[in-house]
């Protein structure tokens, strides 16, 4: 009877997820009875995500300081999980707007899968329980595999198979790590004191190796090295609004789970994270240098961006993950703007190849300026909010070096600055081709004023948040652990 009361009591506190789950069941019915080209799945999905966003925002207004532990510790609802749920919901809304702007005629199954990913990420953001992490991650992963394969083309099937193979491998490695942790700690909740005490009896090296195994599934979703091989092919062939969503939402929540693992302090994971950061930065940046396809370049740069974000997750006596969370907040408009730009450029040129963008910025100067601002934000140059994000991450390295009295972190600072400098070359290739290079025998392009205007809103927001960062910084400070 006591267990039943616990379940009923806990269920009252996840109303947004119940709304989302009910909506997912309803959209299955809508898709089953509507024509293939019906707009009702899109309209219903948009309304459902709006309701979910508002309910997730206002339902948890009076959360206690330590959050709410639900279902006997399976779930943890706190300000941090709420922050990430809001970011993922906003990215879903941007995905739906992106589909509308560029007149993507997706089948209803696409929206069903997208809502499943949203539900999985929602649960993933509010747990410290190994079992919930694994199940939620599998819901996200399986839905993602199907999304990539939705285009009935050979390249999409090949990319989806590669995505599936790497995903299944990383999930198996992760499950093996979880089983080892369960054998050592005799519980599946890594935030419980009993688990931390039991783990402490083992040698640090063994714990670090097992932690790396557990992190495999999360690193796969974050698109961090060495679990990154699926990225370029999937980014190239997947529809732009879908990959725009997948490039942000799983990465953001994956970083949150890594931060929760670091914050629980059952092991010193800095050595493991440093290896991942170094690999992600060097592989992502060097591979991006040689790309001629914009979406493949954004894929490789996303690997490097994962490395920069993980810098903010490194553990120190003063760790609060402020740099990582602020970076993720700014990464939302930057990455969504970048993929909107990519889609608009493809519409105008008929290709994702950067050489085909020659002269587009000369014909439409506002489009060229938007490209400059968005690419500067990805590099981390002023006057864009990307500069603030990079600055806070690099500041956290300096503080870490002072607190830990280790030159390794100062080496990481130099390495990070060098990689940021390298990224200037491949990011600014886009405005270079648009504004500097001239195209001979150039066809007449139909410049879409409305789409350029929407893109301009993203660009202006990147500059405004640089000039007035208080909104973002205060929001992040409220949700720190």
Give residue ranges: language-model regions:
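Alpha-helical transmembrane segments of multi-pass membrane proteins predominantly involved
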Residues: 1-481
């Amino acid at each position: 009877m006591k267990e039943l009361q616990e379940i009923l009591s806990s269920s009252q506190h996840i109303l947004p997820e119940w709304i989302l789950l009910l909506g997912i069941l309803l959209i299955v019915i809508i898709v089953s009875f509507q024509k293939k080209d019906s707009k009702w799945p899109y309209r219903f999905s948009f309304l459902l995500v709006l309701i979910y966003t508002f309910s997730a925002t206002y339902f948890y207004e009076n959360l206690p300081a330590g959050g709410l532990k639900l279902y006997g510790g399976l779930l943890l609802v706190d300000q941090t999980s709420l922050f990430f749920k809001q970011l993922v919901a906003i990215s879903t809304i941007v995905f739906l707007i992106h589909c509308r702007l560029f007149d993507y005629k997706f089948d209803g199954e696409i929206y069903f899968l997208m809502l499943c990913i949203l539900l999985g990420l929602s649960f993933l953001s509010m747990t410290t329980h190994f079992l919930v992490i694994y199940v939620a991650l599998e819901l996200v992963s399986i839905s993602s595999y199907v999304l990539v394969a939705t285009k009935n083309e050979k390249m999409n099937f090949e990319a989806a198979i590669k995505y599936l193979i790497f995903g299944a491998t990383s999930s198996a490695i992760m499950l093996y790590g979880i089983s080892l942790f369960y054998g050592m700690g005799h519980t599946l909740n890594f935030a419980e004191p009993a688990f931390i005490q039991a783990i402490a009896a083992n040698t640090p090296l063994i714990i670090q190796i097992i932690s790396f195994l557990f992190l495999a599934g999360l690193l796969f979703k974050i698109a961090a090295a060495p679990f990154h091989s699926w990225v370029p092919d999937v980014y190239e062939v997947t529809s732009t609004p879908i990959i725009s969503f997948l490039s942000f939402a799983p990465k953001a929540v994956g970083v949150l789970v890594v931060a929760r693992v670091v914050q629980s302090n059952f092991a010193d994971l800095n050595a493991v994270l440093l290896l991942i950061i170094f690999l992600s930065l060097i592989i992502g940046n060097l591979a991006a240098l040689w790309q001629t396809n914009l979406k493949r370049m954004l894929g490789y740069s996303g690997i490097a961006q994962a490395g920069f974000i993980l810098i903010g997750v490194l553990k120190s006596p003063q760790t609060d993950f402020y740099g990582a969370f602020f970076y993720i907040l700014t990464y939302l408009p930057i990455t969504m703007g970048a993929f909107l730009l990519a889609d608009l450029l493809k519409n105008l040129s008929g290709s994702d190849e950067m050489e085909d963008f020659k002269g587009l910025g000369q014909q439409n100067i506002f489009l060229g300026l938007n490209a400059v601002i968005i690419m500067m934000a990805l590099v981390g140059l002023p006057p864009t909010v990307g500069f603030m994000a990079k600055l806070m991450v690099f500041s956290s390295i300096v503080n870490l070096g002072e607190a830990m009295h280790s030159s390794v972190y100062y080496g990481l600072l130099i390495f990070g600055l060098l990689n940021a400098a390298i990224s200037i070359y491949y990011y600014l290739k886009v405005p270079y081709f648009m504004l500097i290079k001239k195209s001979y025998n150039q066809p007449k392009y139909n410049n879409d004023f409305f789409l350029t205007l929407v893109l301009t809103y993203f660009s202006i927001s990147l500059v405004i948040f640089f000039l007035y960062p208080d909104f973002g910084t205060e929001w992040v400070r409220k949700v720190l652990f």
